[in-house]
């Protein structure tokens, strides 16, 4: 597994954000080195509790990664990770940047001052109305 792929998989696991991703990467040397570890090994990492360690250790990453990449491809979406050249520098330098960005269409250069809408994939009707009102 490439580090880029590991980043996508870790992003898919509930409870893993940038802070826990960083702890795992530092503990094992790279994002790809996280996989294949036992729940016990994972649990020894600061901030990784028993439940999260179990989710990571038992995650069917090959199947889930293939499904995610296929779904993105069918939707015309590119997945940008922290490892990709196209990942915006303005986000890369945040304290807690998103591990992945799902981009449809062209991603213009981001200005220093910008607004982003961050949320779940299934937004509510209210969330959709509010998003449209600021664009």
Map each language-model feature to its residues.
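Short, positively charged patches
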Residues: 1-133
């Amino acid at each position: 597994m490439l580090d880029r792929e590991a980043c996508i998989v870790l992003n898919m696991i509930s409870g893993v954000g940038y802070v826990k991703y960083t702890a795992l990467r530092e503990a094992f040397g790279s994002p790809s080195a996280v996989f294949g570890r036992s729940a016990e090994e994972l649990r020894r990492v600061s901030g990784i509790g028993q439940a999260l360690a179990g989710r990571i250790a038992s995650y069917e990453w090959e199947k889930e990664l293939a499904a995610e990449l296929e779904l993105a491809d069918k939707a015309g979406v590119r997945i940008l990770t922290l490892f990709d050249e196209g990942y915006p520098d303005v986000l890369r330098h945040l304290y807690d940047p998103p591990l992945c960005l799902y981009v449809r269409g062209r991603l213009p250069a981001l200005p220093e001052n910008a607004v982003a809408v961050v949320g779940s994939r299934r937004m509510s009707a209210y969330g959709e109305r509010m998003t449209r009102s600021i664009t």
